[in-house]
Protein backbone atom coordinates (compact mmCIF):
# COMPACT_ATOMS: atom_id res chain seq x y z
CA UNK A 1 0.00 0.00 0.00
CA UNK A 2 1.09 3.48 -0.74
CA UNK A 3 0.94 5.93 2.13
CA UNK A 4 -1.79 8.52 1.95
CA UNK A 5 -0.26 11.84 0.92
CA UNK A 6 -0.48 14.46 3.62
CA UNK A 7 -3.24 17.04 3.29
CA UNK A 8 -1.98 20.24 1.76
CA UNK A 9 -1.53 22.88 4.41
CA UNK A 10 -1.69 26.63 3.76
CA UNK A 11 1.65 28.33 3.69
CA UNK A 12 2.48 29.90 7.05
CA UNK A 13 2.18 33.66 7.27
CA UNK A 14 5.50 35.39 7.25
CA UNK A 15 6.23 38.21 9.61
CA UNK A 16 7.61 40.42 6.86
CA UNK A 17 5.24 43.15 5.70
CA UNK A 18 6.19 42.46 2.08
CA UNK A 19 4.77 38.94 2.33
CA UNK A 20 1.40 40.35 3.41
CA UNK A 21 1.09 43.14 0.87
CA UNK A 22 -1.37 43.03 -2.02
CA UNK A 23 -1.17 44.76 -5.41
CA UNK A 24 -3.75 47.51 -5.77
CA UNK A 25 -4.41 49.74 -8.74
CA UNK A 26 -6.20 53.02 -8.11
CA UNK A 27 -6.94 56.06 -10.20
CA UNK A 28 -6.71 59.01 -7.81
CA UNK A 29 -7.57 62.50 -9.03
CA UNK A 30 -6.96 61.41 -12.61
CA UNK A 31 -3.58 59.77 -11.95
CA UNK A 32 -3.06 56.00 -12.02
CA UNK A 33 -1.23 54.41 -9.10
CA UNK A 34 0.10 50.86 -8.79
CA UNK A 35 0.62 50.12 -5.10
CA UNK A 36 1.42 47.24 -2.79
CA UNK A 37 -0.39 47.65 0.52
CA UNK A 38 -1.15 45.57 3.58
CA UNK A 39 -4.74 44.30 3.89
CA UNK A 40 -5.40 46.34 7.03
CA UNK A 41 -4.48 49.73 5.53
CA UNK A 42 -7.51 52.01 5.27
CA UNK A 43 -8.18 54.08 2.19
CA UNK A 44 -7.65 57.15 4.39
CA UNK A 45 -4.16 56.06 5.46
CA UNK A 46 -3.34 55.05 1.90
CA UNK A 47 -4.23 58.52 0.64
CA UNK A 48 -2.47 60.41 3.42
CA UNK A 49 0.59 58.25 4.11
CA UNK A 50 1.28 56.55 0.78
CA UNK A 51 0.15 59.21 -1.72
CA UNK A 52 0.74 62.29 0.46
CA UNK A 53 -2.78 63.63 -0.19
CA UNK A 54 -3.13 65.11 3.27
CA UNK A 55 -6.12 67.39 2.65
CA UNK A 56 -8.35 64.42 3.49
CA UNK A 57 -8.52 64.59 7.29
CA UNK A 58 -8.52 61.96 10.03
CA UNK A 59 -10.99 63.08 12.67
CA UNK A 60 -12.62 60.37 14.75
CA UNK A 61 -11.26 57.42 12.70
CA UNK A 62 -14.55 55.65 13.52
CA UNK A 63 -16.83 56.85 10.71
CA UNK A 64 -18.74 59.29 12.91
CA UNK A 65 -17.53 62.77 11.92
CA UNK A 66 -17.32 62.72 8.10
CA UNK A 67 -13.96 64.54 7.94
CA UNK A 68 -12.47 61.69 5.87
CA UNK A 69 -15.18 61.69 3.17
CA UNK A 70 -13.91 61.13 -0.38
CA UNK A 71 -15.55 60.15 -3.66
CA UNK A 72 -15.15 56.59 -4.96
CA UNK A 73 -16.55 56.12 -8.46
CA UNK A 74 -18.56 59.28 -7.84
CA UNK A 75 -20.11 58.11 -4.56
CA UNK A 76 -19.19 59.54 -1.17
CA UNK A 77 -17.56 57.10 1.22
CA UNK A 78 -15.92 57.31 4.63
CA UNK A 79 -12.33 56.50 3.82
CA UNK A 80 -11.46 55.66 7.44
CA UNK A 81 -13.88 52.70 7.29
CA UNK A 82 -12.83 51.54 3.82
CA UNK A 83 -9.95 49.14 3.29
CA UNK A 84 -7.66 50.13 0.46
CA UNK A 85 -7.52 46.59 -0.98
CA UNK A 86 -11.32 46.60 -1.37
CA UNK A 87 -11.14 49.57 -3.75
CA UNK A 88 -8.81 47.96 -6.26
CA UNK A 89 -9.56 49.35 -9.73
CA UNK A 90 -11.68 52.24 -8.44
CA UNK A 91 -11.62 55.91 -9.34
CA UNK A 92 -11.02 58.00 -6.22
CA UNK A 93 -11.42 61.77 -5.99
CA UNK A 94 -10.23 63.77 -3.00
CA UNK A 95 -10.67 67.48 -2.40
CA UNK A 96 -7.39 68.09 -4.24
CA UNK A 97 -9.04 66.82 -7.43
CA UNK A 98 -12.48 68.44 -7.18
CA UNK A 99 -11.62 71.27 -9.56
CA UNK A 100 -11.33 68.76 -12.42
CA UNK A 101 -14.89 67.51 -11.92
CA UNK A 102 -17.96 68.86 -13.68
CA UNK A 103 -21.44 68.97 -12.20
CA UNK A 104 -24.09 66.53 -13.48
CA UNK A 105 -26.24 67.95 -16.26
CA UNK A 106 -29.34 67.18 -14.17
CA UNK A 107 -28.23 69.49 -11.35
CA UNK A 108 -29.87 72.89 -11.53
CA UNK A 109 -27.49 75.54 -10.32
CA UNK A 110 -26.56 79.16 -10.36
CA UNK A 111 -23.17 80.10 -11.70
CA UNK A 112 -21.41 79.39 -8.43
CA UNK A 113 -18.10 79.45 -10.27
CA UNK A 114 -18.45 83.13 -11.06
CA UNK A 115 -16.45 85.73 -9.21
CA UNK A 116 -17.59 86.71 -5.74
CA UNK A 117 -19.74 89.87 -5.81
CA UNK A 118 -17.88 93.11 -5.10
CA UNK A 119 -20.04 93.68 -2.03
CA UNK A 120 -18.62 90.55 -0.44
CA UNK A 121 -14.93 91.29 -0.87
CA UNK A 122 -12.47 93.86 -2.11
CA UNK A 123 -11.48 94.04 -5.77
CA UNK A 124 -8.01 92.53 -5.26
CA UNK A 125 -9.15 89.34 -3.47
CA UNK A 126 -12.04 89.10 -5.93
CA UNK A 127 -9.63 89.05 -8.87
CA UNK A 128 -7.57 86.35 -7.17
CA UNK A 129 -10.65 84.22 -6.44
CA UNK A 130 -11.88 84.54 -10.02
CA UNK A 131 -8.65 83.08 -11.40
CA UNK A 132 -8.46 80.07 -9.07
CA UNK A 133 -9.28 76.72 -10.73
CA UNK A 134 -12.00 75.70 -8.28
CA UNK A 135 -15.08 73.51 -8.34
CA UNK A 136 -18.35 75.51 -8.16
CA UNK A 137 -18.89 74.19 -4.63
CA UNK A 138 -15.47 75.44 -3.56
CA UNK A 139 -16.36 78.85 -4.96
CA UNK A 140 -19.71 78.78 -3.15
CA UNK A 141 -18.03 77.84 0.16
CA UNK A 142 -15.74 80.83 -0.22
CA UNK A 143 -18.59 83.13 -1.16
CA UNK A 144 -20.70 82.09 1.83
CA UNK A 145 -17.81 81.85 4.33
CA UNK A 146 -18.77 78.23 4.91
CA UNK A 147 -15.78 77.37 7.10
CA UNK A 148 -13.88 78.60 10.13
CA UNK A 149 -10.98 76.37 11.18
CA UNK A 150 -11.37 74.44 7.90
CA UNK A 151 -10.62 70.98 9.30
CA UNK A 152 -13.97 69.53 8.22
CA UNK A 153 -14.10 71.43 4.91
CA UNK A 154 -12.51 68.77 2.63
CA UNK A 155 -15.02 66.19 3.84
CA UNK A 156 -17.90 68.67 3.62
CA UNK A 157 -17.00 69.47 0.00
CA UNK A 158 -16.65 65.85 -1.10
CA UNK A 159 -19.89 64.96 0.66
CA UNK A 160 -21.69 67.85 -1.05
CA UNK A 161 -20.44 66.72 -4.47
CA UNK A 162 -21.68 63.21 -3.67
CA UNK A 163 -25.03 64.65 -2.61
CA UNK A 164 -25.39 66.39 -5.98
CA UNK A 165 -24.40 63.20 -7.81
CA UNK A 166 -27.10 61.28 -5.92
CA UNK A 167 -29.74 63.76 -7.07
CA UNK A 168 -31.99 63.13 -4.07
CA UNK A 169 -31.92 66.58 -2.44
CA UNK A 170 -34.84 68.69 -3.62
CA UNK A 171 -35.35 71.03 -0.66
CA UNK A 172 -33.26 72.88 1.89
CA UNK A 173 -34.36 70.45 4.61
CA UNK A 174 -33.24 67.50 2.49
CA UNK A 175 -29.86 69.15 1.96
CA UNK A 176 -29.51 69.53 5.75
CA UNK A 177 -30.51 65.91 6.32
CA UNK A 178 -28.24 64.46 3.64
CA UNK A 179 -25.28 66.52 4.88
CA UNK A 180 -25.88 65.61 8.54
CA UNK A 181 -23.15 62.96 8.52
CA UNK A 182 -20.53 65.69 8.24
CA UNK A 183 -19.93 67.46 11.54
CA UNK A 184 -18.57 70.99 11.95
CA UNK A 185 -17.13 71.69 15.40
CA UNK A 186 -17.13 75.42 14.64
CA UNK A 187 -20.88 75.39 13.96
CA UNK A 188 -20.79 76.85 10.43
CA UNK A 189 -23.88 74.85 9.43
CA UNK A 190 -25.96 77.82 8.15
CA UNK A 191 -23.16 78.90 5.79
CA UNK A 192 -22.49 75.32 4.66
CA UNK A 193 -26.19 74.80 3.94
CA UNK A 194 -26.34 78.07 2.02
CA UNK A 195 -23.33 77.14 -0.12
CA UNK A 196 -24.61 73.66 -0.94
CA UNK A 197 -28.11 74.95 -1.69
CA UNK A 198 -26.72 77.55 -4.07
CA UNK A 199 -25.07 74.88 -6.21
CA UNK A 200 -27.38 71.90 -5.69
CA UNK A 201 -30.73 73.72 -5.77
CA UNK A 202 -29.87 76.95 -7.54
CA UNK A 203 -31.15 79.11 -4.67
CA UNK A 204 -29.51 81.59 -2.33
CA UNK A 205 -30.82 80.15 0.91
CA UNK A 206 -28.88 82.66 3.00
CA UNK A 207 -30.95 85.50 1.52
CA UNK A 208 -34.27 83.68 1.15
CA UNK A 209 -34.78 82.67 4.80
CA UNK A 210 -37.88 84.00 6.46
CA UNK A 211 -37.64 85.69 9.83
CA UNK A 212 -38.82 82.44 11.43
CA UNK A 213 -36.02 80.46 9.75
CA UNK A 214 -33.20 82.83 10.63
CA UNK A 215 -30.65 81.37 13.01
CA UNK A 216 -30.47 82.91 16.47
CA UNK A 217 -26.97 83.95 17.48
CA UNK A 218 -25.30 81.31 19.63
CA UNK A 219 -27.41 78.39 18.43
CA UNK A 220 -26.73 75.59 15.99
CA UNK A 221 -29.56 74.58 13.63
CA UNK A 222 -30.82 71.01 13.79
Language-model-detected regions and their locations in the chain:
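Signature of N-terminal electron-transfer/Fe-S-associated modules in redox systems
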Residues: 1-222
